[in-house]
Amino acid sequence: MLLLEAATRTGWIDRNQMVAPSEILAHVAAIIPSTHFVTDLTRTSVTILAAFALGVLGGVPLGVLLWRVRVIGRVLEPFIVTGYAMPTLLFYPILVAVLGLNAGPIVVIASTMALIPIALTTMVALGDVKPVLHKLARSVDASRRQQYFKVLFPAATPLIFPGIKLGFIYAVIGTIAMEFILASKGLGFRAGFMYRELYVADMWAYIAIVVVFSIAVNSALGLAERAIRRDML
């Protein structure tokens, strides 16, 4: 940070591209009390969390299905991987026609981006559970629910949760990118507006806010992972 501060202050880095970290912090402090910041933060937070929740609620069961029914897994996995590489922005006009010009299309696109890595890692994680654990569950006459929640998911959690964290990252990327290009409110929209209007310091301030938000939620997911593993064992 000190090197970046010195480089921007001395002109080694073009101030039209990057400003000093101290200046970014000053702009963050000025932005946070503003009324439009609360609106933008609320819109982006709700969109990200909705997309992430849909990604988890859809991705984990899909991953279980792909693992449990091997035929479906073999058939669908190539299409899911292909969809992972497909630019989902192409579907935005269709989603606007169906859902309207609101946050709905952004939530759908961001949740799809989050769902795919969660589903794939869930499938792989359950497939890596040691066979002896399956035998153990059957030997104690565990119900199907007990097998999943007392044996399989605790054993697979170390691999599932990295996929969930990756899904959150993709939910953030999808939301911010879509807001940057297409939305009329949100942190991504505001950063894009500042970029187009050449307010470089404000643009970096909004980027810094998004980074801090992402780190905070990712840290919360790490705490949740440890709590869930402790409760499920």
What are these regions (language model features)?
Residues 1-12:
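N-terminal signal-anchor transmembrane alpha helix
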Residues 10-53:
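Periplasmic/extracellular loop-to-transmembrane helix junction in inner-membrane transport proteins
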Residues 97-98, 173-210, 229-233:
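Glycine-rich helix-loop "coupling/hinge" segments at transmembrane-helix boundaries
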Residues 121-164, 187, 191:
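Short cytoplasmic-facing helical segments at TM-TM junctions of multi-pass membrane proteins
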Residues 70, 127, 162, 204-233:
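C-terminal transmembrane helix and the adjacent membrane-cytosol boundary/short C-terminal tail
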Residues 108-112, 144-178, 205, 217, ...:
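Transmembrane alpha-helices
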Residues 50-80:
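Transmembrane-helix boundary motif in ABC transporter permease subunits
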Residues 81-117, 124-125:
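Generic hydrophobic transmembrane alpha-helix motif, especially the helices
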